[in-house]
A protein has these predicted regions:
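Acidic catalytic motifs of isoprenoid enzymes
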Residues: 1-172
Length: 172
């Protein structure tokens, strides 16, 4: 976790994923901590109901720019902690952007009563894209990894949605 900003280290170490990630070999562990940290940051932005939608959208746009800079050699700003994982495991920019785009769907409220195709797109962005990043870290063959990410990501995200349905209904 040495590449992670201090405040992010606390969030990662407090996560239920921490114990599982902690037993990975150091390069994979550090990469997974970075991926988790990124996901946590953009999810927190999307979920911050105290901030106006416009501010949350602007913060997500800033992250899009930082991710782009990470791949073009520009100033990646806060996203700089991802650089070691991106370079070592050849993580794809499109997957990071997909995660941000999924969070944007939360901000824009596109998933309150989605069509099947919108729900599928949302699951791809917020779950399968994370899976695609993860299978690269684990060294899985590309086609098999993409297939696994596709199905497992959707299954896990739909389970997450169903698990939270009562809580979400109470919120409105």
């Amino acid at each position: 976790m040495s590449d992670l900003p201090e405040q992010l280290r606390a969030k990662v170490s407090g996560s239920s994923f921490y114990a599982g990630m902690r037993i990975l070999p150091k390069p994979e562990r550090e990469a997974m901590f970075a991926i988790y940290g990124f996901c946590r940051i953009v999810d927190d932005i999307a979920d911050d109901e105290t901030a106006p939608r416009t501010a949350r959208a602007a913060a997500l746009d800033q992250w899009r720019g930082q991710i782009a800079a990470l791949y073009t050699g520009g100033d990646a700003g806060e996203a700089g902690f991802l650089a070691p994982a991106v370079h070592r495991f050849r993580l794809e920019q499109a997957d990071f952007i997909a995660v941000i785009d999924g969070m944007q769907m939360d901000v824009d409220d596109y998933i309150r009563w989605p069509s099947y195709s919108t729900l599928d797109l949302y699951c791809d962005r917020v779950a399968s894209a994370v899976g695609r990043l993860s299978v690269r870290v684990f060294g899985m063959e590309r086609d098999a990894g993409i297939d696994l990410s596709h199905h497992l990501g959707r299954a896990l995200q739909l389970t997450n949605i169903l698990r939270d349905i009562d809580e979400d209904a109470a919120i409105g």
